[in-house]
């Protein structure tokens, strides 16, 4: 009634036999009839013609033949771009108009000397920080007396620090300053 397991394992599995009439195109047998030389020549000619048309036609060109962007660029090219010399006077005027003019009563109060431990208001600190930035992108100057540099520019390694910091400021490498690491290691 039951077969022993060893006999069932030794026996080869029966392959399911069903209708194998459907095949995919990729698994279909190759045609037994060889193509003629004329057929091969026509196929190669069509392929060469398609490649030639692709390489010489304007249909597949990178730049479109008509574009609104081209017209906008031509109009903007006629306008001169602002230069640093043309921007400086405008920036100075904005700063002067934005800065409140001190009255006679306020002037003596501002001239009082503050000690190093004196407490300043947040507005005064912001104004001082705006004036004492390490680098001014408008003029391209580096303020070596800026307290944010911690006096490194005037210390024992001052010249090395100036070279390294200048390299960092003017670096165009991404991420910023990657080409200046060795100079900072020397400091």
From Swiss-Prot:
Q: Where is the CHCH domain?
A: 154-187
What are the boundaries of the region Disordered?
73-115
Q: One GO cellular component term, please give it.
A: mitochondrial intermembrane space
Question: Start and end of the transit peptide?
Answer: 1-24
Single GO molecular function: protein-disulfide reductase activity
Purpose of the protein: Required for the import and folding of small cysteine-containing proteins (small Tim) in the mitochondrial intermembrane space (IMS). Forms a redox cycle with ERV1 that involves a disulfide relay system. Precursor proteins to be imported into the IMS are translocated in their reduced form into the mitochondria. The oxidized form of MIA40 forms a transient intermolecular disulfide bridge with the reduced precursor protein, resulting in oxidation of the precursor protein that now contains an intramolecular disulfide bond and is able to undergo folding in the IMS.
Protein's name according to its UniProt entry? Mitochondrial intermembrane space import and assembly protein 40
User: To which species is this protein native?
Assistant: Aspergillus oryzae (strain ATCC 42149 / RIB 40) (Yellow koji mold)
């Amino acid at each position: 009634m039951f077969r022993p397991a060893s006999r069932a394992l030794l026996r080869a599995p029966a392959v399911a036999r069903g209708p194998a009439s459907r095949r995919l195109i990729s698994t279909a047998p190759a045609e037994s009839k060889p193509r003629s030389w004329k057929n091969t020549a026509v196929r190669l000619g069509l392929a060469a013609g398609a490649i030639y048309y692709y390489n010489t036609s304007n249909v597949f060109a990178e730049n479109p033949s008509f574009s609104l962007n081209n017209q906008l660029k031509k109009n903007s090219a006629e306008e001169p771009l602002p230069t640093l010399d043309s921007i400086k006077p405008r920036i100075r005027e904005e700063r002067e108009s934005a800065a409140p003019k001190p009255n006679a009563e306020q002037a003596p109060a501002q001239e009082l000397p503050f000690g190093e431990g004196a407490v300043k208001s947040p507005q005064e600190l912001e104004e001082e920080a705006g004036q004492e930035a390490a680098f001014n992108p408008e003029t391209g100057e580096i303020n070596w007396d800026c307290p944010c540099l911690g006096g490194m520019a005037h210390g024992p390694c001052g010249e090395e620090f100036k070279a390294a910091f200048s390299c960092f400021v003017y670096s165009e490498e991404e991420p910023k300053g990657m080409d200046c690491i060795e100079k900072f290691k020397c400091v």
